[in-house]
Amino acid sequence: MDSIVTTEDTIAAIASAISIGKGGVAIIRVSGKDSINSCKKIVQTKSKYAWESHRVFHGFILENKQNKFIDEVLILVMKSPNSFTGEDVVELHCHGGIILVNKVLQRLLSSNSRVRLANPGEFSQRAFLNGKIDLTQAESINQLINASNTRSAELAFSGVQGKIKKKINDIKNDLINQLCEIEARVDFEEDFTDFDYNKYLKNIKKVKEKIELLIENAKRNSYIHNGISIALIGKTNVGKSSLLNLLAKKEKAIVTNIPGTTRDVIEVNLTINDIPMKIIDTAGIRETHEQIESIGIKKSFRKIKESDFIIYIYSLEEGFNKEDKKIIQEIPKEKLITILGNKKDLIDCKNINSNELKNTILMSIKNNDGERLLIDTIIKKCGLKQVENINIFLNERHLTNLSSCLSNLNDTDVIIKNKLPFDLLSIELRDGIQNLSKITGQELTEELLDNIFSKFCIGK
């Protein structure tokens, strides 16, 4: 076991969610070498199990020395090193009113000058520093707390279990094996004439494929956790607001036959197939001299740039014309896009030009004909059709370090193909390994660690 990092001060905070100001139970967590003694000063108990490790016992919180009680509580003690933080930890399980639990917390803080309010994420930071969890597990705990849907929670929990660390360490070990062979030759100045370049390139290719798969999944599982922002784009009166109302299952936008009714952006947050989606209704795009409508149209183009996915809607009655083509040309080529032909109930689909049908969803928004096909198309194009195959959540920090490692490995290819000195190969492999180590927290500065944990909630 890693040695336990001790600090002079003991920290305390409310660890349970009481955002509405009341609940059945609230938990105050205390961690540090003075946690038990500090709690002893404010707790009165007759339990025979009092202050034993991993025992729950009953007691009262004393307001003062005159034996006036604040609350009746359950107390859980977890002695070092067998606790979340690796330090002595005490949990006070109080009644859940915010006024009451804050009073208990203030009583605790005033009992000992070495007990202070915890900083955001400080319990998890101490757990990390004491080797109880790695950085990906700490981040996954925060991700789990902030999960917006069940699939996001499942992915976060896999990180809590250490699955991210395992995948990263497997890749790192592959690179360490390659580095050992290279450095043995460099250190002993052996001749590289018998070095199997093809075998090396083959092994590195396998490692790169593993990293590329993780990067690909990282982009997809961002949709699962953060959601997909979907902009409804098109000319006036093609059915954008009607589609928003259909997906929302309620009237969120005003629908009329008057062109230019929608003049501002309307956003609705939904969960479809357990994936959060933000549907954005925009002003219809057309030439206009009306000032307010023009502002709305500018916002439409802004939303095109900001959104993950574009649904371009046109009227099958009018057909896909030059104006539609001109608008689509304004959409960045890297954007995911689906073209939707609306009002199929008003035309004979057999008469539609076959080129117009290519990669187009035909729909009658008014009659709710084609909604399932549209949703399936969005999920497929976002790479979420086999969402069950994505089994870990990688955040932007992980993605950055994986991309840096991949760049290091691509540089080793260049070194070998151009027959550059082998010590350069060793440097790139070491840098690649270092980038992977940053993911699990082995190669990070104190400042960066503080920044990561500052984004956690106070009681975690």
Swiss-Prot record:
Signal peptide: none annotated. Pfam families: MMR_HSR1, MnmE_helical, TrmE_N. Exhibits a very high intrinsic GTPase hydrolysis rate. Involved in the addition of a carboxymethylaminomethyl (cmnm) group at the wobble position (U34) of certain tRNAs, forming tRNA-cmnm(5)s(2)U34. (6S)-5-formyl-5,6,7,8-tetrahydrofolate binds at residues 29, 91, 132, 460. Its cofactor is K(+). One of its GO terms (biological process) is tRNA methylation. Its EC number is 3.6.-.-. It comes from the Bacteria. One of its GO terms (cellular component) is cytosol. Belongs to the TRAFAC class TrmE-Era-EngA-EngB-Septin-like GTPase superfamily. TrmE GTPase family. CDD domains: trmE, TrmE_N. This is tRNA modification GTPase MnmE. Homodimer. Heterotetramer of two MnmE and two MnmG subunits. Gene3D superfamilies: P-loop containing nucleotide triphosphate hydrolases (3.40.50.300), Probable tRNA modification gtpase trme, domain 1 (3.30.1360.120), tRNA modification GTPase MnmE domain 2 (1.20.120.430). K(+) binds at residues 237, 256, 258, 261. It is found in: Cytoplasm. Keywords: Cytoplasm, GTP-binding, Hydrolase, Magnesium, Metal-binding, Nucleotide-binding, Potassium, tRNA processing. Residues 227-383 form the TrmE-type G domain. One of its GO terms (molecular function) is GTPase activity. It is an enzyme of class 3 (hydrolase). Mg(2+) binds at residues 241, 262. Binds 1 potassium ion per subunit.
